[in-house]
Amino acid sequence: MNATILVKIITPLSIALEKQAKMVTMSGEEGMFGVLPSHVPMIVSLKAGLVQVYIDDMHKSENTYLISGGVTEVTANYINIATETAINVTNLSEVEIATKLLDLQKTLSDQH
C-alpha cells in the first residue's frame, strides 16, 4: 500500500506538523484509534495523549507528539488535529514521555 494521507497538527501558535503519512494513531475520548488513507470522514474529540505518525513503515512510528487533547477532522485525504499544546517527543525515552504526560495532565487539571 503506497497511499498516504496528509496529517496536520495545529496549535494556536503554529502548525506543529504537516506531513504525508501511511497511518496515524491517537487517543479519542472512547479509546485509541488509527486512521489510514481513504478513511471514512469523521470528527472526534481527543484526550491528552500521544499522536503517532507512521511515515514509511506502518510498524514503527516516525513522529510522535504529545497533545493536550483537542479535536480531529478526518477525511479520505487529510487529518487535521487541532490542539492547544503539541510537544514533539519523537526522540524521548518512554520514561521521559511518561513524565511529560503526567506534567501535562497536572497542568490541565490545575486549569479546570
UniProtKB/Swiss-Prot annotation:
Molecular function terms from GO: ATP binding; proton-transporting ATP synthase activity, rotational mechanism
InterPro entries (alphabetical):
ATP_synth_F1_dsu/esu (IPR001469), ATP_synth_F1_dsu/esu_N (IPR020546), ATPsynth_dsu/esu_N (IPR036771)
Q: Where does this polypeptide localize?
A: Cell inner membrane
Signal sequence region: none
Q: How does it sit in the membrane?
A: Peripheral membrane protein
Q: How does it assemble?
A: F-type ATPases have 2 components, CF(1) - the catalytic core - and CF(0) - the membrane proton channel. CF(1) has five subunits: alpha(3), beta(3), gamma(1), delta(1), epsilon(1). CF(0) has three main subunits: a, b and c.
Job description of the protein: Produces ATP from ADP in the presence of a proton gradient across the membrane.
Provide the protein name. ATP synthase epsilon chain
Q: Could you tell me which species this protein originates from?
A: Rickettsia conorii (strain ATCC VR-613 / Malish 7)
